[in-house]
């Protein structure tokens, strides 16, 4: 399984922008934005990465994750979410825009304070996506060399007993007026693949 590093994310989206950029003079911005988004989704499908877009606002799972457990039980799962904003708009993503989440079929919630929620002393190099208020703002930009990444932290809810050897995460969210569902599957060797659910 090929990992989508930040560098490959930038290369892919940059190459796609150049490939469809020439069409802009002939067909208008909306057509170019839609073509760029469509190519990005197709690339994600081919490489085993959940990827989607709202025009030229593109987002994906990098297939990087970090679990925390107590004994045999999963207490927190952080997954890296990447965004490239090639629009002229500021887009705000809120934790509350994640309308549902499940780990191994059990309800899960987005956690803003891992220390308080799961007694995790810090995410270390895993930068949280959302701030303490549960928001992330993506500024406008046309920089092909800039993508933003951060970790969304999920925790099983209630009495759910999810194994530290979890097998699937599914979450649905609204971003820039579009609803998407991403599914991440953990393989026996610990590697993961992800996909956009139709």
Where are these regions (language model features)?
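N-terminal secretory signal peptides and thylakoid transit peptides that target proteins
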Residues: 1-20, 24-27
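Bacterial signal peptide processing site
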Residues: 30-31
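Low-complexity, acidic Ser/Thr/Pro/Gly-rich terminal tails and inter-domain linkers that flank the onset
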Residues: 38-72
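Glycine-centered tight beta-turn/hairpin loop motif at sheet-sheet or coil-to-beta transitions
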Residues: 54, 107, 175-179
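Short, solvent-exposed beta-strand/turn "edge" segments of beta-rich domains on protein surfaces
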Residues: 63-78, 90, 141-143
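Short, well-ordered beta-strand segments enriched in hydrophobic/aromatic residues
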Residues: 77-85
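The feature marks short-to-medium sequence segments in extracytoplasmic or secretory-pathway proteins
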Residues: 84-148
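Surface-exposed edge beta-strand/loop patches
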Residues: 142-198
């Amino acid at each position: 399984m090929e990992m989508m590093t930040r560098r490959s994310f930038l290369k892919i989206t940059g190459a796609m922008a150049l490939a469809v950029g020439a069409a802009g003079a002939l067909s208008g911005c909306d057509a170019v934005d839609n073509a760029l988004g469509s190519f990005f989704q197709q690339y994600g499908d081919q490489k085993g990465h959940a990827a989607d877009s709202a025009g030229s606002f593109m987002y994906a799972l990098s297939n990087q994750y970090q679990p925390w457990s107590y004994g045999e039980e999963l207490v927190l799962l952080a997954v890296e979410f990447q965004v490239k904003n090639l629009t002229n708009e500021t887009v705000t993503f809120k934790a509350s825009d994640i309308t549902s989440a499940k780990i191994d079929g059990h309800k899960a919630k987005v956690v803003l304070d891992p220390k308080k929620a799961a007694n995790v002393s810090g995410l270390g190099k895993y930068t949280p996506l959302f701030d303490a208020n549960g928001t992330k703002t993506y500024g406008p930009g046309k920089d092909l060399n800039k993508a933003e990444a951060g970790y969304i932290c999920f925790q099983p809810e209630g009495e759910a007993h999810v194994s530290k050897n979890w097998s699937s995460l599914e979450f649905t969210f609204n971003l820039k007026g579009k609803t998407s569902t991403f599914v991440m599957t953990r393989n026996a060797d610990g590697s993961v693949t992800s996909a956009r659910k139709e």
